[in-house]
Protein backbone atom coordinates (compact mmCIF):
# COMPACT_ATOMS: atom_id res chain seq x y z
CA UNK A 1 0.00 0.00 0.00
CA UNK A 2 1.36 3.44 -0.98
CA UNK A 3 1.76 5.97 1.82
CA UNK A 4 -0.33 9.10 1.41
CA UNK A 5 0.54 11.03 4.56
CA UNK A 6 3.32 9.40 6.57
CA UNK A 7 6.89 10.14 5.54
CA UNK A 8 10.08 8.81 7.12
CA UNK A 9 9.44 10.93 10.22
CA UNK A 10 5.67 11.11 10.60
CA UNK A 11 3.36 13.64 8.95
CA UNK A 12 4.90 17.04 8.24
CA UNK A 13 4.17 20.20 6.28
CA UNK A 14 3.39 23.91 6.32
CA UNK A 15 0.78 24.87 8.90
CA UNK A 16 -2.55 25.74 7.30
CA UNK A 17 -1.73 23.69 4.20
CA UNK A 18 -2.79 20.06 3.85
CA UNK A 19 -2.13 17.91 5.76
CA UNK A 20 -1.17 20.19 8.68
CA UNK A 21 -4.63 21.68 9.23
CA UNK A 22 -6.80 21.50 12.37
CA UNK A 23 -9.46 19.34 10.75
CA UNK A 24 -6.96 16.82 9.37
CA UNK A 25 -5.04 16.59 12.64
CA UNK A 26 -8.29 15.95 14.52
CA UNK A 27 -9.10 13.17 12.06
CA UNK A 28 -5.55 11.85 12.46
CA UNK A 29 -6.05 11.69 16.23
CA UNK A 30 -9.34 9.89 15.75
CA UNK A 31 -7.86 7.43 13.22
CA UNK A 32 -4.89 6.66 15.48
CA UNK A 33 -7.28 6.30 18.40
CA UNK A 34 -9.45 3.76 16.60
CA UNK A 35 -6.37 1.70 15.68
CA UNK A 36 -5.17 1.78 19.30
CA UNK A 37 -8.62 0.84 20.58
CA UNK A 38 -8.77 -2.20 18.30
CA UNK A 39 -5.38 -3.47 19.50
CA UNK A 40 -5.87 -2.78 23.23
CA UNK A 41 -6.26 -5.46 25.85
CA UNK A 42 -9.90 -6.14 26.66
CA UNK A 43 -9.72 -4.74 30.20
CA UNK A 44 -7.69 -1.62 29.46
CA UNK A 45 -8.47 1.80 28.03
CA UNK A 46 -5.86 3.36 25.72
CA UNK A 47 -3.91 6.30 27.13
CA UNK A 48 -1.80 8.52 24.86
CA UNK A 49 0.85 11.09 25.82
CA UNK A 50 1.06 14.26 23.71
CA UNK A 51 4.09 16.55 23.71
CA UNK A 52 5.05 19.45 21.50
CA UNK A 53 7.85 21.88 20.74
CA UNK A 54 7.59 25.67 21.07
CA UNK A 55 5.91 26.62 17.77
CA UNK A 56 2.84 28.84 18.06
CA UNK A 57 0.85 26.30 16.03
CA UNK A 58 1.46 23.66 18.71
CA UNK A 59 -1.43 24.97 20.79
CA UNK A 60 -3.89 24.58 17.92
CA UNK A 61 -2.66 21.17 16.82
CA UNK A 62 -2.51 19.85 20.39
CA UNK A 63 -6.19 20.76 20.88
CA UNK A 64 -7.12 19.12 17.56
CA UNK A 65 -5.28 15.90 18.41
CA UNK A 66 -6.83 15.82 21.87
CA UNK A 67 -10.32 16.17 20.38
CA UNK A 68 -9.71 13.37 17.90
CA UNK A 69 -8.40 10.96 20.51
CA UNK A 70 -11.26 11.80 22.89
CA UNK A 71 -13.82 11.15 20.14
CA UNK A 72 -12.26 7.70 19.68
CA UNK A 73 -12.54 6.92 23.40
CA UNK A 74 -8.83 7.39 24.16
CA UNK A 75 -7.57 9.18 27.28
CA UNK A 76 -4.92 11.84 26.79
CA UNK A 77 -2.05 13.08 28.95
CA UNK A 78 -0.60 16.47 27.99
CA UNK A 79 3.11 16.99 28.62
CA UNK A 80 3.40 20.48 27.14
CA UNK A 81 6.68 21.58 25.51
CA UNK A 82 9.02 18.58 25.72
CA UNK A 83 11.83 17.16 23.56
CA UNK A 84 10.85 14.41 21.14
CA UNK A 85 13.03 11.81 22.94
CA UNK A 86 11.39 12.79 26.25
CA UNK A 87 8.01 11.69 24.91
CA UNK A 88 9.53 8.39 23.75
CA UNK A 89 10.98 7.82 27.23
CA UNK A 90 7.87 8.87 29.19
CA UNK A 91 5.55 6.76 27.02
CA UNK A 92 7.62 3.69 27.89
CA UNK A 93 8.21 4.62 31.54
CA UNK A 94 4.53 5.30 32.25
CA UNK A 95 3.36 2.16 30.39
CA UNK A 96 1.14 4.19 28.07
CA UNK A 97 -0.42 3.01 24.81
CA UNK A 98 1.41 5.49 22.56
CA UNK A 99 3.19 8.83 22.47
CA UNK A 100 2.65 11.67 20.02
CA UNK A 101 4.96 14.60 19.31
CA UNK A 102 3.88 17.81 17.59
CA UNK A 103 7.06 19.13 16.00
CA UNK A 104 8.84 19.82 12.72
CA UNK A 105 12.27 19.34 14.30
CA UNK A 106 14.85 21.71 12.74
CA UNK A 107 12.38 23.37 10.33
CA UNK A 108 11.21 27.02 10.72
CA UNK A 109 8.20 27.87 12.89
CA UNK A 110 5.80 28.01 9.91
CA UNK A 111 6.10 24.21 9.58
CA UNK A 112 4.87 21.55 11.96
CA UNK A 113 4.34 17.82 12.06
CA UNK A 114 3.00 14.85 13.97
CA UNK A 115 5.05 11.78 14.84
CA UNK A 116 4.08 8.74 16.87
CA UNK A 117 5.86 6.44 19.30
CA UNK A 118 4.76 2.95 20.27
CA UNK A 119 4.28 1.80 23.87
CA UNK A 120 7.91 0.64 23.87
CA UNK A 121 9.20 4.13 23.01
CA UNK A 122 10.06 3.26 19.41
CA UNK A 123 8.77 4.84 16.23
CA UNK A 124 5.60 3.15 15.03
CA UNK A 125 6.05 0.10 12.79
CA UNK A 126 5.18 0.66 9.13
CA UNK A 127 2.22 -1.70 9.43
CA UNK A 128 0.60 0.44 12.15
CA UNK A 129 1.17 3.65 10.19
CA UNK A 130 -0.54 2.04 7.21
CA UNK A 131 -3.47 1.02 9.44
CA UNK A 132 -3.81 4.63 10.56
CA UNK A 133 -3.72 5.81 6.94
CA UNK A 134 -6.48 3.32 6.08
CA UNK A 135 -8.55 4.55 9.04
CA UNK A 136 -8.18 8.13 7.77
CA UNK A 137 -10.20 7.14 4.72
CA UNK A 138 -13.14 6.18 6.92
CA UNK A 139 -15.65 8.84 8.06
CA UNK A 140 -15.00 10.28 11.51
CA UNK A 141 -17.65 9.65 14.14
CA UNK A 142 -17.75 9.74 17.93
CA UNK A 143 -18.09 7.12 20.65
CA UNK A 144 -21.02 7.28 23.06
CA UNK A 145 -20.79 10.06 25.65
CA UNK A 146 -20.00 7.67 28.50
CA UNK A 147 -17.01 6.33 26.51
CA UNK A 148 -15.40 9.66 25.56
CA UNK A 149 -11.76 10.09 26.47
CA UNK A 150 -10.55 12.37 29.25
CA UNK A 151 -7.52 14.69 29.21
CA UNK A 152 -5.18 15.76 31.99
CA UNK A 153 -1.78 17.41 32.42
CA UNK A 154 1.33 15.38 33.24
CA UNK A 155 2.75 17.78 35.80
CA UNK A 156 6.04 16.01 36.54
CA UNK A 157 7.12 15.30 32.94
CA UNK A 158 10.06 17.70 33.09
CA UNK A 159 11.49 16.34 36.34
CA UNK A 160 11.10 12.71 35.27
CA UNK A 161 12.96 13.32 32.02
CA UNK A 162 15.76 15.32 33.65
CA UNK A 163 16.41 12.42 36.03
CA UNK A 164 16.38 9.96 33.13
CA UNK A 165 18.97 12.01 31.21
CA UNK A 166 21.21 12.22 34.27
CA UNK A 167 20.97 8.45 34.73
CA UNK A 168 22.74 7.92 31.38
CA UNK A 169 25.89 9.66 32.69
CA UNK A 170 28.35 7.47 34.66
CA UNK A 171 27.76 7.59 38.43
CA UNK A 172 31.48 7.90 39.15
CA UNK A 173 31.82 11.05 37.02
CA UNK A 174 30.54 14.61 37.28
CA UNK A 175 30.87 17.87 35.35
CA UNK A 176 32.39 20.02 38.08
CA UNK A 177 35.00 22.36 36.66
CA UNK A 178 33.40 22.30 33.20
CA UNK A 179 32.04 25.52 31.72
CA UNK A 180 29.38 24.79 29.10
CA UNK A 181 27.37 26.91 26.69
CA UNK A 182 24.08 25.16 25.90
CA UNK A 183 22.11 26.33 22.84
CA UNK A 184 18.48 25.19 23.00
CA UNK A 185 17.42 26.61 19.58
CA UNK A 186 14.49 28.36 21.33
CA UNK A 187 13.00 24.88 21.18
CA UNK A 188 11.56 22.12 23.31
CA UNK A 189 14.62 21.65 25.55
CA UNK A 190 14.82 25.30 26.65
CA UNK A 191 13.64 24.48 30.21
CA UNK A 192 15.39 21.12 30.46
CA UNK A 193 18.86 20.89 28.89
CA UNK A 194 20.54 23.65 30.95
CA UNK A 195 19.29 22.03 34.18
CA UNK A 196 20.53 18.55 33.22
CA UNK A 197 24.10 19.75 32.81
CA UNK A 198 23.89 22.09 35.82
CA UNK A 199 22.65 19.33 38.12
CA UNK A 200 25.63 17.20 37.06
CA UNK A 201 27.95 19.97 38.23
CA UNK A 202 28.66 22.08 35.15
CA UNK A 203 28.70 25.86 35.03
CA UNK A 204 26.08 26.50 32.35
CA UNK A 205 25.51 29.50 30.10
CA UNK A 206 22.21 29.01 28.26
CA UNK A 207 21.46 30.64 24.91
CA UNK A 208 18.54 30.11 22.54
CA UNK A 209 16.37 29.57 25.62
CA UNK A 210 13.75 32.31 25.15
CA UNK A 211 11.07 30.79 22.88
CA UNK A 212 8.22 33.06 21.81
CA UNK A 213 6.38 30.75 19.42
CA UNK A 214 8.02 32.22 16.33
CA UNK A 215 11.79 31.95 16.85
CA UNK A 216 12.42 28.19 17.02
CA UNK A 217 15.67 27.32 15.15
CA UNK A 218 16.04 30.95 14.03
CA UNK A 219 19.71 31.86 14.24
CA UNK A 220 20.29 29.32 16.99
CA UNK A 221 20.61 25.57 17.42
CA UNK A 222 22.31 22.69 15.65
CA UNK A 223 21.54 24.03 12.18
CA UNK A 224 22.93 27.52 12.95
CA UNK A 225 26.13 27.04 14.98
CA UNK A 226 27.54 30.58 14.58
CA UNK A 227 25.76 31.83 17.73
CA UNK A 228 27.18 28.95 19.76
CA UNK A 229 30.72 29.48 18.45
CA UNK A 230 30.53 33.17 19.37
CA UNK A 231 29.14 32.42 22.86
CA UNK A 232 31.79 29.78 23.60
CA UNK A 233 34.56 32.21 22.71
CA UNK A 234 32.97 35.18 24.49
CA UNK A 235 32.47 33.21 27.72
CA UNK A 236 35.79 31.34 27.47
CA UNK A 237 33.83 28.10 27.88
CA UNK A 238 35.34 24.64 27.65
CA UNK A 239 32.61 23.38 25.35
CA UNK A 240 29.41 24.31 23.55
CA UNK A 241 26.44 22.04 22.86
CA UNK A 242 23.73 22.90 20.32
CA UNK A 243 20.41 21.06 20.06
CA UNK A 244 17.74 21.49 17.40
CA UNK A 245 14.10 22.47 17.90
CA UNK A 246 12.94 19.11 19.25
CA UNK A 247 16.32 18.18 20.79
CA UNK A 248 16.87 14.90 18.96
CA UNK A 249 20.14 16.01 17.33
CA UNK A 250 23.24 17.91 18.40
CA UNK A 251 26.56 19.36 17.41
CA UNK A 252 29.46 20.27 19.67
CA UNK A 253 31.91 23.18 19.65
CA UNK A 254 35.28 23.16 21.45
CA UNK A 255 36.98 26.04 23.29
CA UNK A 256 38.70 27.16 20.09
CA UNK A 257 35.36 27.49 18.29
CA UNK A 258 35.78 24.42 16.10
CA UNK A 259 32.51 22.65 15.23
CA UNK A 260 32.37 18.84 15.48
CA UNK A 261 29.76 17.12 13.33
CA UNK A 262 27.98 13.81 13.79
CA UNK A 263 30.71 11.76 12.09
CA UNK A 264 33.34 13.01 14.52
CA UNK A 265 31.00 12.53 17.48
CA UNK A 266 30.29 8.95 16.40
CA UNK A 267 34.03 8.29 16.26
CA UNK A 268 34.46 9.65 19.81
CA UNK A 269 31.57 7.53 21.12
CA UNK A 270 32.91 4.33 19.56
CA UNK A 271 36.45 5.03 20.74
CA UNK A 272 35.20 5.62 24.31
CA UNK A 273 33.11 2.45 24.33
CA UNK A 274 36.07 0.43 23.09
CA UNK A 275 38.06 1.75 26.02
CA UNK A 276 35.40 0.59 28.51
CA UNK A 277 34.08 -2.57 26.87
CA UNK A 278 34.70 -3.60 23.23
CA UNK A 279 31.72 -3.31 20.90
CA UNK A 280 31.02 -5.32 17.78
CA UNK A 281 30.09 -2.56 15.38
CA UNK A 282 28.59 0.84 14.58
CA UNK A 283 26.22 2.15 11.92
CA UNK A 284 26.57 5.28 9.79
CA UNK A 285 24.83 6.33 6.59
CA UNK A 286 25.67 6.49 2.90
CA UNK A 287 27.05 9.98 3.61
CA UNK A 288 29.27 9.03 6.57
CA UNK A 289 32.88 9.98 5.92
CA UNK A 290 35.04 7.10 4.68
CA UNK A 291 37.66 7.97 7.30
CA UNK A 292 35.38 6.38 9.93
CA UNK A 293 35.12 3.17 7.93
CA UNK A 294 38.93 2.98 7.73
CA UNK A 295 39.43 3.88 11.40
CA UNK A 296 36.85 1.40 12.67
CA UNK A 297 38.43 -1.37 10.61
CA UNK A 298 41.79 -0.64 12.25
CA UNK A 299 40.09 -0.72 15.67
CA UNK A 300 38.45 -4.08 14.93
CA UNK A 301 34.98 -2.54 14.90
CA UNK A 302 32.45 -3.51 12.26
CA UNK A 303 30.82 -0.76 10.22
CA UNK A 304 27.60 -0.73 8.21
CA UNK A 305 25.97 2.00 6.14
CA UNK A 306 22.25 2.74 6.21
CA UNK A 307 20.21 5.03 3.98
CA UNK A 308 20.26 8.67 5.05
CA UNK A 309 17.91 9.24 8.01
CA UNK A 310 18.00 8.20 11.65
CA UNK A 311 15.06 5.85 11.07
CA UNK A 312 17.22 3.76 8.73
CA UNK A 313 20.25 3.88 11.03
CA UNK A 314 18.00 2.48 13.76
CA UNK A 315 16.76 -0.31 11.47
CA UNK A 316 20.31 -1.47 10.67
CA UNK A 317 21.36 -1.28 14.33
CA UNK A 318 18.50 -3.59 15.24
CA UNK A 319 19.24 -5.96 12.37
CA UNK A 320 22.88 -6.24 13.46
CA UNK A 321 22.22 -6.23 17.20
CA UNK A 322 24.55 -3.23 17.60
CA UNK A 323 24.02 -0.21 19.85
CA UNK A 324 25.80 2.87 18.49
CA UNK A 325 25.13 4.78 15.28
CA UNK A 326 24.62 8.21 13.83
CA UNK A 327 24.74 10.54 10.88
CA UNK A 328 26.71 13.64 10.04
CA UNK A 329 23.75 15.92 10.79
CA UNK A 330 24.08 15.05 14.48
CA UNK A 331 21.35 12.45 14.91
CA UNK A 332 23.10 10.02 17.25
CA UNK A 333 21.75 6.70 18.53
CA UNK A 334 22.91 5.00 21.72
CA UNK A 335 20.53 2.07 22.10
CA UNK A 336 22.17 1.05 25.37
CA UNK A 337 20.87 4.36 26.76
CA UNK A 338 17.65 5.17 24.88
CA UNK A 339 15.30 3.77 22.24
CA UNK A 340 15.62 6.80 19.97
CA UNK A 341 17.98 9.65 19.08
CA UNK A 342 18.40 12.07 21.98
CA UNK A 343 20.55 15.21 21.77
CA UNK A 344 20.96 15.62 25.53
CA UNK A 345 21.79 11.96 26.16
CA UNK A 346 24.24 11.96 23.23
CA UNK A 347 25.93 15.09 24.59
CA UNK A 348 26.34 13.33 27.93
CA UNK A 349 28.09 10.43 26.19
CA UNK A 350 30.55 12.86 24.61
CA UNK A 351 31.12 14.57 27.97
CA UNK A 352 31.71 11.23 29.68
CA UNK A 353 34.30 10.35 27.01
CA UNK A 354 36.08 13.65 27.67
CA UNK A 355 36.00 13.15 31.44
CA UNK A 356 37.05 9.51 31.28
CA UNK A 357 39.99 10.17 28.98
CA UNK A 358 41.09 13.52 30.37
CA UNK A 359 41.51 14.66 26.76
CA UNK A 360 39.98 17.46 24.70
CA UNK A 361 37.81 16.97 21.62
CA UNK A 362 40.76 17.90 19.41
CA UNK A 363 42.97 15.34 21.15
CA UNK A 364 40.31 12.61 20.93
CA UNK A 365 40.00 13.14 17.17
CA UNK A 366 43.64 13.87 16.30
CA UNK A 367 44.22 10.30 15.09
CA UNK A 368 41.48 10.48 12.45
CA UNK A 369 41.62 12.75 9.42
CA UNK A 370 38.35 13.13 7.57
CA UNK A 371 38.51 12.53 3.82
CA UNK A 372 37.75 15.64 1.76
CA UNK A 373 34.31 15.38 0.16
CA UNK A 374 33.08 17.10 -2.98
CA UNK A 375 29.31 17.24 -3.43
CA UNK A 376 27.80 18.46 -6.69
CA UNK A 377 24.04 18.84 -7.20
CA UNK A 378 22.92 18.52 -10.81
CA UNK A 379 19.43 19.60 -11.89
CA UNK A 380 17.60 16.98 -13.95
CA UNK A 381 14.15 16.48 -15.41
CA UNK A 382 11.57 15.19 -12.89
CA UNK A 383 11.51 11.40 -12.90
CA UNK A 384 15.02 11.08 -14.35
CA UNK A 385 16.59 7.70 -13.49
CA UNK A 386 20.38 8.03 -13.34
CA UNK A 387 20.79 4.26 -13.07
CA UNK A 388 19.74 3.94 -16.72
CA UNK A 389 22.37 6.40 -18.00
CA UNK A 390 25.06 4.14 -19.47
CA UNK A 391 27.65 6.92 -19.90
CA UNK A 392 27.23 7.95 -16.28
CA UNK A 393 27.52 4.37 -15.02
CA UNK A 394 30.66 3.80 -17.09
CA UNK A 395 32.27 6.99 -15.75
CA UNK A 396 31.33 6.03 -12.19
CA UNK A 397 33.00 2.62 -12.62
CA UNK A 398 36.11 4.23 -14.11
CA UNK A 399 36.43 6.69 -11.23
CA UNK A 400 35.91 3.94 -8.64
CA UNK A 401 38.66 1.88 -10.28
CA UNK A 402 41.06 4.84 -10.16
CA UNK A 403 40.26 5.59 -6.51
CA UNK A 404 40.55 1.98 -5.35
CA UNK A 405 40.45 1.82 -1.56
CA UNK A 406 41.49 5.46 -1.24
CA UNK A 407 38.09 6.95 -1.93
CA UNK A 408 34.49 6.28 -2.89
CA UNK A 409 31.68 7.52 -5.09
CA UNK A 410 28.05 8.05 -4.13
CA UNK A 411 25.31 9.04 -6.55
CA UNK A 412 21.76 9.46 -5.31
CA UNK A 413 18.57 11.26 -6.25
CA UNK A 414 17.22 13.95 -3.95
CA UNK A 415 14.02 12.92 -2.21
CA UNK A 416 12.52 16.42 -2.40
CA UNK A 417 13.86 18.12 -5.54
CA UNK A 418 14.66 17.14 -9.18
CA UNK A 419 18.36 16.85 -8.38
CA UNK A 420 21.01 14.16 -8.65
CA UNK A 421 23.65 14.42 -5.93
CA UNK A 422 27.18 13.35 -6.90
CA UNK A 423 29.56 12.90 -3.98
CA UNK A 424 33.19 11.82 -4.21
CA UNK A 425 35.52 11.25 -1.26
CA UNK A 426 39.27 10.93 -1.59
CA UNK A 427 42.31 11.45 0.60
CA UNK A 428 43.27 14.37 -1.65
CA UNK A 429 40.78 17.26 -2.01
CA UNK A 430 41.85 18.08 -5.57
CA UNK A 431 41.31 14.48 -6.67
CA UNK A 432 37.85 14.40 -5.03
CA UNK A 433 36.89 17.61 -6.83
CA UNK A 434 38.25 16.45 -10.19
CA UNK A 435 36.51 13.06 -10.02
CA UNK A 436 33.17 14.55 -8.94
CA UNK A 437 33.24 16.99 -11.84
CA UNK A 438 34.00 14.18 -14.28
CA UNK A 439 30.93 12.26 -13.17
CA UNK A 440 28.67 15.33 -12.96
CA UNK A 441 29.64 16.27 -16.52
CA UNK A 442 27.93 13.10 -17.77
CA UNK A 443 24.68 14.31 -16.18
CA UNK A 444 24.94 17.78 -17.66
CA UNK A 445 24.92 16.59 -21.26
Swiss-Prot record:
Any single GO CC term annotated in Swiss-Prot or TrEMBL for this entry: cytosol
GO biological process terms, alphabetically, are: carbohydrate metabolic process; peptidoglycan biosynthetic process; UDP-N-acetylglucosamine biosynthetic process
Top-level EC class as recorded in UniProt:
isomerase
Q: Name one GO molecular function term.
A: phosphoglucosamine mutase activity
**Keyword Cell inner membrane found:** no
Q: Which cofactor does it need?
A: Mg(2+)
Task: Fill in the PTM field for this protein.
Answer: Activated by phosphorylation.
Positions annotated as active site in the UniProt record? 105
Residues where Phosphoserine is found: 105
Query: Reaction(s) catalyzed by this protein?
Result: alpha-D-glucosamine 1-phosphate = D-glucosamine 6-phosphate
Q: Which CDD domains does the record cross-reference, listed alphabetically?
A: GlmM
Its biological purpose: Catalyzes the conversion of glucosamine-6-phosphate to glucosamine-1-phosphate.
HAMAP family reported in the protein's UniProt record:
GlmM_B (MF_01554_B)
State the name under which the record lists this protein: Phosphoglucosamine mutase
Amino acid sequence: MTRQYFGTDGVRGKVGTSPITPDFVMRLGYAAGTVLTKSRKASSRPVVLIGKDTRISGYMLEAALEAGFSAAGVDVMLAGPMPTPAIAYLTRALRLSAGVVISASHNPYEDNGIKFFSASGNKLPDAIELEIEAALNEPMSCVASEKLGRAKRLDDARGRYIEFCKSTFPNELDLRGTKLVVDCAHGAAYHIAPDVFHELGAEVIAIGNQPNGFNINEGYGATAPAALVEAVRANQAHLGIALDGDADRLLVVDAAGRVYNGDELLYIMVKDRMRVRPIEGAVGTLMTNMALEVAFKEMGVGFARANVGDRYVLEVLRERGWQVGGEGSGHMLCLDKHTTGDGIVSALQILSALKRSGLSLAELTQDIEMFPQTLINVKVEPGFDWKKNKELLAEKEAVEAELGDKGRVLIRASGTEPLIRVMVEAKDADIADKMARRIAAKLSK
